[in-house]
């Protein structure tokens, strides 16, 4: 995907393919289905829209860009993010935002629309984490040890 000259890429019927958008820059990627682990890892400025759910480790070590998931995300969402933005309409799993860090003008941002699991923001060294709890019936929309 990084080698293609196409700037706009659309994937239909995605069923767990991993590493989509890894290291990409200046691409517009639209995914229908459920991408696998490490979606947008090491990304450097692309935009990814997922119309479905996403598996674990989306945005792993991401430098820049935006990932929008119009469903739920798995565990370790935004692991070691250094920049960029991740928006998840629904829930995210355990260890969301773990080991996030900001450096100079890079400030990672994760916004979760509903709930997150335990260990949210563990070892965070910068960046912004927001959990809205829009559909949550719990007293607090975050898990334990946050």
Where on the chain are the PLM-derived regions?
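Long, distal/terminal scaffolding or interaction modules
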Residues: 1-146
